């Protein structure tokens, strides 16, 4: 009995410590990244997401408002069966429950941003995105509903552009061909006329010269020449 009485103070102290530590152990559901005393659910955290489709993936930029008192942001994206989905960017610590822990103690900013990437085939409307904003050992928790984003189809080239190009190009080719043809014809006609005129003049000159030579070289021309010399000599003497 005396030994039991001596153990009672120690048992009471142990029970007090267990009761004191139990709230923090039950509240810390983020997988040993950090111990939280209290977690409050809030719908006024003004968390926003913006999607950007690239190739076969869609990247959501998650923006969380913070201040100098915020020491960390914890993010978690899980499917309906509580399995994790997607990949996160930046420097973080991965917790045991598939959440990611971003330490902000050395940063001073008004917003925290990170990227979450999933395949375009993933139905993100069934994904539960949880955000915890940690101040000291107290966290405000909020869930964000994601919107499905489909990749936009490429814009086809309007047919009117191709038609316009054909209409504008064809007259130019025809005009060029017509101009070249007319120029060739004009050059040919001019060359022919010039050649004909030159040939005619040359032929006429050659004919007259030949006629004069033939006239002077005939017997009648010689007789006339002798008679002319005889008459001139009579007049002089």
Curated annotation (Swiss-Prot):
<dbReference type="GO" id="GO:0016324">
    <property type="term" value="C:apical plasma membrane"/>
</dbReference>
<dbReference type="GO" id="GO:0035313">
    <property type="term" value="P:wound healing, spreading of epidermal cells"/>
</dbReference>
<feature type="lipid moiety-binding region" description="GPI-anchor amidated serine">
    <location>
        <position position="218"/>
    </location>
</feature>
<keyword id="KW-0472">Membrane</keyword>
<comment type="function">
    <text>Modulates leading keratinocyte migration and cellular adhesion to matrix proteins during a wound-healing response and promotes wound repair. May play a role during trichilemmal differentiation of the hair follicle.</text>
</comment>
<dbReference type="GO" id="GO:0001953">
    <property type="term" value="P:negative regulation of cell-matrix adhesion"/>
</dbReference>
<keyword id="KW-0732">Signal</keyword>
<feature type="glycosylation site" description="N-linked (GlcNAc...) asparagine">
    <location>
        <position position="136"/>
    </location>
</feature>
<feature type="glycosylation site" description="N-linked (GlcNAc...) asparagine">
    <location>
        <position position="30"/>
    </location>
</feature>
<dbReference type="GO" id="GO:0009897">
    <property type="term" value="C:external side of plasma membrane"/>
</dbReference>
<feature type="glycosylation site" description="N-linked (GlcNAc...) asparagine">
    <location>
        <position position="103"/>
    </location>
</feature>
<protein>
    <recommendedName>
        <fullName>Placenta-expressed transcript 1 protein</fullName>
    </recommendedName>
</protein>
<keyword id="KW-0336">GPI-anchor</keyword>
<feature type="propeptide" description="Removed in mature form">
    <location>
        <begin position="219"/>
        <end position="237"/>
    </location>
</feature>
<feature type="region of interest" description="Disordered">
    <location>
        <begin position="145"/>
        <end position="170"/>
    </location>
</feature>
<keyword id="KW-0449">Lipoprotein</keyword>
<feature type="glycosylation site" description="N-linked (GlcNAc...) asparagine">
    <location>
        <position position="67"/>
    </location>
</feature>
<dbReference type="GO" id="GO:0030335">
    <property type="term" value="P:positive regulation of cell migration"/>
</dbReference>
<feature type="compositionally biased region" description="Polar residues">
    <location>
        <begin position="145"/>
        <end position="162"/>
    </location>
</feature>
<dbReference type="GO" id="GO:0030154">
    <property type="term" value="P:cell differentiation"/>
</dbReference>
<keyword id="KW-0221">Differentiation</keyword>
<keyword id="KW-0325">Glycoprotein</keyword>
<dbReference type="InterPro" id="IPR026184">
    <property type="entry name" value="PLET1"/>
</dbReference>
<feature type="signal peptide">
    <location>
        <begin position="1"/>
        <end position="27"/>
    </location>
</feature>
<keyword id="KW-1003">Cell membrane</keyword>
